[in-house]
Amino acid sequence: MLFTLEEYKCRLKKVQKMMQVKGIELLISHDTNNMNYLTGYDAWSFYYAQCAIVHVNADEPLCFVRAQDAGGAYITTYLKNENIIVYDENYIHTWPKHPYDYLVEIIKERKWDKLNIGVEMDAHYFTAFCLSLIHISEPTRQP
C-alpha cells in the first residue's frame, strides 16, 4: 500500500460524509483512479468490469474484480479478503451474461437493492449497458 491504513480510512469517511450530503446510500465507483483512492487497488485491469462499492455505513468498501485480477486486489488493497468480490471468468464475453449480473446479485444478497444507489456516469468502460443492468434490477430508479 502506498498510504497508511489510517489515510484510506480517512478517505472513506470523507466519501461517506459526501454521500450522506447527497442522499446516496450505496456508491458504485468504476473510475480506476477513484478505486485506487478508496482501496489502494492498482492493476492494469480497467478494460473489464470492476468497481469499488461504498456503503454509507460500512467500515470498508468492496472491491469487485474478475477472478484473474483478484490477486492484484489481495496484494494492493487494505481490504479484508471477504470485501474483495470476485466474479468468474464465465461472465466475460458470454452474451447475454455480464459481470454486472453478478454485481446485482451481490447487491441483492446484501439487501442493498432498495438503497439510493449512486454511480459514476463518466468512467471509461462503464457503459450504458452496465447502467441498464443496474436499472433493470432496480425498476424504481431514476437516471
Located regions from the model:
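Terminal domain-start leader segments
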Residues: 1-59, 108
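A short acidic, often aromatic-flanked loop/helix-cap motif at beta-alpha or helix-coil junctions
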Residues: 89-96, 141
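Rossmann-like NAD(P)H-binding beta-loop-alpha module
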Residues: 129-131
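Single conserved hydrophobic/aromatic residue that forms the stacking wall/gate
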Residues: 134-143
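General beta-strand structural signal in soluble alpha/beta enzymes
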Residues: 27-30, 119, 137
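Compact, glycine/acidic-enriched structural inserts
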Residues: 62-91
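Structural motif
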Residues: 32, 65-68, 119-124
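Hydrophobic alpha-helical hairpins/lids featuring a short glycine-rich hinge
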Residues: 95-125
